[in-house]
Amino acid sequence: MVVGLFGGSFNPPHQGHALVAEIAIKRLGLDQLWWMVTPGNPLKSRNQLAPLAERIAESERVAADPRVKVTAFEQSLGVSYTANTLAWVKARNPHVHFIWIMGADGLQTFHKWQKWQEIVRTFPIAVIDRPGATLSYLSSKMTRTFDFARVDEDDARILWKKPAPAWTFIHGPRSGLSSTAIRNGSVPDDSE
């Protein structure tokens, strides 16, 4: 089984997130995508963070594809860092092939994540294009450090077969929606 792991605050979740999930499922040939709603992001302020239960319920509403499984198991683990969560997931699912899914906009700060290089060396990563990040992702510390591990986009369906480090950049339809803009009232919330 091939499972994509798509984590985030989803504060709020919106159709842009659903589009990333849809692209990942299609282009990577995923059997499932685990939409992991995090209790909080250590790199972001919690001032405007909606309650976890609300973000889970909204994520379930937005993620219509039956292959998408919304989860918030990170809260029960009592961990705050993605590297710890992913190590736990991998240890408990040794026969599942996981791919970490992230938006290209997240690459600019990925090197600030705790144990970010360990994440890259443990899981293949699919980076999904986002508006404003199509070219800027090339200058990210992750892509420069692991340039040797880039897998051609045409081979995205076999990314799960590649030993980490391995990553690909997937172009495709992009949504200009952002949770920050929705919270600030800059764009309408299209999650309905």
UniProtKB/Swiss-Prot annotation:
GO molecular function: ATP binding; nicotinate-nucleotide adenylyltransferase activity
EC number: 2.7.7.18
Keyword field: ATP-binding, NAD, Nucleotide-binding, Nucleotidyltransferase, Pyridine nucleotide biosynthesis, Transferase
Listed pathway(s): Cofactor biosynthesis; NAD(+) biosynthesis; deamido-NAD(+) from nicotinate D-ribonucleotide: step 1/1
Record carries keyword Nucleotidyltransferase: yes
Superkingdom of source: Bacteria
Catalytic activity entry: nicotinate beta-D-ribonucleotide + ATP + H(+) = deamido-NAD(+) + diphosphate
A Pfam family per the record: CTP_transf_like
Alphabetical GO biological process terms: NAD biosynthetic process
HAMAP family cross-referenced by the UniProt entry: NaMN_adenylyltr (MF_00244)
NCBIfam families listed in its UniProt record: nicotinate (nicotinamide) nucleotide adenylyltransferase, PRK00071.2-2, PRK00071.2-4
Role, per record: Catalyzes the reversible adenylation of nicotinate mononucleotide (NaMN) to nicotinic acid adenine dinucleotide (NaAD).
UniProt record similarity statement: Belongs to the NadD family.
Name of this protein: Probable nicotinate-nucleotide adenylyltransferase
The species this protein was found in: Rhizobium leguminosarum bv. trifolii (strain WSM2304)
Lineage, highest ranks first: Bacteria, Pseudomonadati, Pseudomonadota, Alphaproteobacteria, Hyphomicrobiales
Gene from which this protein is expressed: nadD
